[in-house]
Amino acid sequence: MIQFTKMHGLGNDFMVVDGVTQNVFFSPEQIRRLADRNFGIGFDQLLLVEPPYDPDLDFHYRIFNADGTEVEQCGNGARCFARFVRNKGLTNKSKIRVSTSSGKMTLRLERDGTVTVNMGVPILEPSQIPFKAKKPEKTYLLQTPMQTFLCGAASMGNPHCVLDVEDVASASVAEIGAMLTKHERFPRGVNVGFMQVVDSGHIKLRVYERGAAETLACGTGACAAVVVGQVQGKLGQQVRVDLPGGTLTINWEGEGKPLWMTGPAQHVYDGQIQL
């Protein structure tokens, strides 16, 4: 039997598994079965806590989408990860350092119950996103058989393109998201953000996630949207991001500086399951 915890960050929900005290391995097929909301546990991503590979770090953090693919980063998951390792007694630290497949992160448990995550320095160089373009631009043209889209592009350890929309509530997120997530200019696929700028300190956002469709919240998507908005001169240093599942606060001092994300992490229940 495998012990697990169900958690969510603004409705972006996770199955979190302790791979430090348990010996666990998940095949893509098992993950897809567990992610099924009718026949399994149901989740957007599976988060796996592993021992650190580096003695200077506390844990290694792995993320698997509902379709069984392993991905580089998940911001909402990082907040739940921090809350999980503290709740389970795997650490007593309030500042936790972890590695992911895309780099290192610092997670900080705040006194008010929220979690602040140092998401690292955003990547704007196209080849590192990865995105096919000759040089970094504030805005790119993405052509599809149906229409051409204007977008910004950035990586928070995973690739994002961000579209400006007048009204996020009426945006064709499912249709356009499905079209762009596998666009040929993003060799590893892309998460697609739909951003409505309310003012320089406030945006509304919906995100179509690569491998998971639209979710109630996407932490890295919120970060990428603020980066793109700031690069385009539309947003300031601290931005409130309203997602369908709730609100995140993003703070970024500009290019070359790390980005900080603050938001909630909720425990739902503990369970056990036979694979």
Curated annotation (Swiss-Prot):
Q: Where does substrate bind?
A: 12, 45, 65, 75-76, 158, 191, 209-210, 219-220
Originating species: Shewanella baltica (strain OS155 / ATCC BAA-1091)
One GO cellular component assignment for this chain's record is: cytosol
Swiss-Prot/TrEMBL site (Important for dimerization) positions? 269
Q: Which domain of life is it from?
A: Bacteria
Q: Does the keyword 4Fe-4S apply?
A: no
Report the function annotation for this chain. Catalyzes the stereoinversion of LL-2,6-diaminopimelate (L,L-DAP) to meso-diaminopimelate (meso-DAP), a precursor of L-lysine and an essential component of the bacterial peptidoglycan.
UniProt keywords (A-Z) are: Amino-acid biosynthesis, Cytoplasm, Isomerase, Lysine biosynthesis
Q: Which InterPro entries match?
A: DAP_epimerase_AS, DAP_epimerase_DapF
Q: What class of enzyme is it?
A: isomerase
Q: How does it assemble?
A: Homodimer.
Which positions are catalytic residues? 74, 218
Location in or out of the cell: Cytoplasm
Name of protein: Diaminopimelate epimerase
Supply the HAMAP family for this chain. DAP_epimerase
Q: Which family does it belong to?
A: Belongs to the diaminopimelate epimerase family.
Q: What's a BP term from Gene Ontology annotated to this protein?
A: lysine biosynthetic process via diaminopimelate
Q: List the PROSITE patterns hit by this protein, alphabetically.
A: DAP_EPIMERASE
Keyword Cytoplasm present in the record's keywords: the answer is yes
Q: In which pathway does it act?
A: Amino-acid biosynthesis; L-lysine biosynthesis via DAP pathway; DL-2,6-diaminopimelate from LL-2,6-diaminopimelate: step 1/1
- What is the catalytic activity of this protein? (2S,6S)-2,6-diaminopimelate = meso-2,6-diaminopimelate
Predominantly, its location class is: cytoplasm
